[in-house]
Design a protein with these regions (language model features):
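A short, flexible loop at the N-terminus of ABC-type nucleotide-binding domains that lies
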Residues: 1-4, 13-26
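The feature captures the beta-strand-to-loop junction immediately N-terminal to the Walker
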Residues: 40-42
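Helix-to-loop junction immediately C-terminal to a conserved catalytic motif
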Residues: 55
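Conserved ABC transporter NBD signature motif
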Residues: 63-75
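Short coil-to-helix segment of the ABC ATPase nucleotide-binding domain corresponding to the Q-loop/switch region
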Residues: 92-100
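Conserved ABC ATPase "signature" region
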Residues: 103, 110-129, 180-181
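Conserved signature/switch motifs of ABC ATPase nucleotide-binding domains
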Residues: 132-135, 153
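Helical segment within the ABC ATPase nucleotide-binding domain
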Residues: 172-187
Length: 260
């Protein structure tokens, strides 16, 4: 089966008056349709740059990116992107934020778009908060709105750049559990998820991509052979989880030493 997304020898160099910085070098990666891929690596290894290339916010300096087997250039509107900052429009209510992507794509009637947004908010525990503005929502609530805003128009590939990074530990666990549930309800949806948290990467992913120190490349891809559905609150007690964690950490620790 053709991967939904492929990177072939992708490199990205940033140029400035002070010289060149090679963020990524010769990245080869296939992402299969319907899988959950997590990405870890030392700070500054180009993880966010990788997602920006995937969605088309920037072009590779060298190499090729394929979407469903065809060269992809420019912004790919088939791909959803959830950032660490919630980026909610402060002048729009939660309901209006969720319906934004539907409005831009003119999906359904206005009433149908509002109804879908309302149902999604209820699905993530925000019934009754439809008319609240960003400043009236907690950080966890904002990120729930941010996630379902992307899910609303049903992209087949969703990129997530440390979406739970700023949140407290308990809220992170709750949203990890919610994300797995929402993904499980959408067969065929593919997720690529960046995180600094190895426990999060293993608990969520089908595979963990370990990036090298800058310039970033794929050092190792570690399969996560844990059954689904997963209990996010207890999976870390599984002996198999510990073995996978140790394997991922061994690769990452070496790269962190290189980055110092």
């Amino acid at each position: 089966m053709t991967p939904i997304l492929s990177l072939r020898g992708v490199s990205r160099t940033f140029r400035s008056p002070r010289g060149e910085v090679v963020a990524l070098r010769d990245v080869d990666l296939d992402v299969r349709e319907g899988e959950f891929v997590t990405v870890v690596g030392p700070s500054g290894c180009g993880k966010s740059t990788l997602l920006n290339l995937m969605v088309g916010l920037m072009e590779p300096t060298r190499g090729e990116l394929l979407y469903r087997g065809r060269p992809s250039r420019g912004i790919n509107r088939d791909i959803g992107y959830v950032t660490q900052a919630d980026n909610l429009f402060p002048w729009r209510t939660a309901l209006q934020n969720v319906s934004f992507g539907l409005d831009m794509r003119r999906i359904g009637t206005s009433a149908e778009r509002r109804d879908r947004a309302r149902r999604l908010l209820a699905r993530v525990g925000l019934a009754g908060f439809e008319n609240h503005y960003r400043h009236e929502l907690s950080g966890g609530m904002r990120q729930r709105v941010n996630i379902v805003r992307t899910l609303a128009y049903e992209p087949k590939l969703i990129l997530l750049d440390e979406p739970f990074g700023p949140l407290d530990a308990q809220t992170r666990l709750q949203l990890q559990d919610l994300l797995l549930t929402l993904w499980g309800e959408r067969p065929g949806t593919t997720l690529v998820f960046i995180t600094h948290d190895l426990t999060e990467a293993i608990a969520l992913g089908d595979r963990v991509v370990v990036m090298s120190a800058r310039p970033g490349r794929v050092r190792e891809v570690v399969p996560v052979d844990l059954t689904r559905p997963r209990d996010i609150f207890s999976i870390h007690t599984d002996a198999r989880f510990r073995a996978i964690y140790d394997r991922v950490w061994a690769h990452l620790a070496e790269e962190m030493k290189e980055a110092v």
